[in-house]
């Protein structure tokens, strides 16, 4: 009996094995309700959370888990690069270029003296000097226009007289009548035009070194009973000499050397004088005054070689 039961059980098992296994019912996609799904794997290798895939919407879901609104391919997770407008970069570059172009090449460079729009009263001159375009006598002829109609002699006399009157206003004890009474003879100014810049520059160079000595004795007798024209009177005019701009460096160096030599000679002549006797100043200015259109008399032995170098 037992053998018969064992044979029946074995035959029953073989029949079950021969019968095809019925496939498990496919789950519907929770997103698109499609039955075209398949089992993929167990989430985290756990039998409690199997993971399925929907072939219709091509997205995954986990049984027993929450659904995430994830698009196909997960493109929303990629960082989108925002393109900046190119106008901002162009505006910054243009502002930098404009600032560089507006700045001068040399900020310390002094512009031409004639182009400076200073009022003539700034230098103590009258209003009619502006019509001459600020052509001062200290500027050589190559810096000024020779076609101007204003006379240089009138400018020089106006320039010198206004400089002397401004000194009297400073309270230095200088008389106001020196501007027209006993300043400089007219023939002294109306000399040859080629020697005017050199003559005035020589006077300005000598006034800088001996101004302190002459300021202590502002009243010195001169020819014809007038006051002596001290070198300190031209000190204000010498300050304007620093405003000049030369066109040739070699010419300026040559003129500076000549000015230093002239000022040194005059200082030596002044220091060699024995005393401040008024007669010595009378002799000096009588010899240096203009006689018949001549600036100096080189045959006179009373005047040292320092004054003959001014010719």
Curated annotation (Swiss-Prot):
| Listed transmembrane segments | none
Q: What is this protein called?
A: Dof zinc finger protein DOF1.4
> Which intervals carry biased composition (Low complexity)?
13-26, 85-107
Q: Where is this region: Disordered?
A: 1-29, 72-110
| Domain of life of the organism encoding this protein | Eukaryota
A cellular component term from Gene Ontology for this protein is: nucleus
The Gene Ontology terms for molecular function here are: DNA binding; DNA-binding transcription factor activity; zinc ion binding
Sites where the protein binds Zn(2+): 29, 32, 54, 57
Cite the record's Polar residues compositional bias ranges. Answer: 1-12
Q: Which InterPro entries match?
A: Dof, Znf_Dof
Species for this entry: Arabidopsis thaliana (Mouse-ear cress)
Q: Which keywords does the record carry?
A: DNA-binding, Metal-binding, Nucleus, Transcription, Transcription regulation, Zinc, Zinc-finger
Which compartments does it reside in? Nucleus
Q: What ranges of residues constitute the Dof-type zinc fingers? A: 27-81
Q: Which PROSITE patterns match?
A: ZF_DOF_1, ZF_DOF_2
* Protein function: Transcription factor that binds specifically to a 5'-AA[AG]G-3' consensus core sequence.
């Amino acid at each position: 009996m037992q053998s018969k039961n064992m044979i029946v059980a074995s035959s029953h098992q073989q029949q079950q094995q021969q019968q095809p296994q019925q496939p498990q019912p496919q789950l519907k996609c929770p997103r698109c309700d499609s039955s075209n799904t398949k089992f993929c794997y167990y989430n985290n290798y756990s039998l409690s959370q199997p993971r399925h895939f929907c072939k219709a919407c091509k997205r995954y879901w986990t049984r027993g888990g929450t659904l995430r609104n994830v698009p196909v391919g997960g493109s929303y997770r990629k960082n989108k690069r925002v393109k900046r407008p190119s106008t901002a970069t162009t505006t910054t570059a243009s502002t930098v270029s404009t600032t560089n172009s507006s700045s001068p090449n040399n900020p310390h460079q002094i512009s031409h003296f004639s182009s400076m729009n200073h009022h003539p009263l700034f230098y103590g001159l009258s209003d009619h000097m502006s019509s001459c375009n600020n052509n001062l006598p200290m500027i050589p002829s190559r810096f000024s226009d020779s076609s101007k109609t204003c006379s240089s002699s009138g400018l020089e006399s106006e320039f010198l007289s206004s400089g002397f009157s401004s000194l009297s206003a400073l309270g230095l004890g200088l008389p106001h009548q020196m501007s027209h009474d006993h300043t400089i003879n007219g023939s002294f100014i109306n000399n040859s035009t080629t020697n005017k810049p050199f003559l005035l520059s020589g006077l300005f160079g000598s006034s800088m070194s001996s101004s302190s000595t002459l300021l202590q004795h502002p009243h010195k007798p001169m020819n014809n009973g007038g006051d002596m024209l001290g070198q300190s009177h031209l000190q204000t005019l010498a300050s304007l000499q620093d405003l000049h701009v030369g066109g040739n460096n070699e010419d300026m160096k040559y003129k500076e050397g000549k000015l230093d030599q002239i000022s040194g000679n005059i200082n030596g002549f002044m220091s060699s004088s024995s005393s401040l006797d008024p007669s010595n100043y009378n002799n000096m200015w009588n010899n240096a005054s203009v006689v018949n259109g001549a600036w100096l008399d080189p045959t006179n032995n009373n005047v040292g070689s320092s004054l003959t170098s001014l010719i």
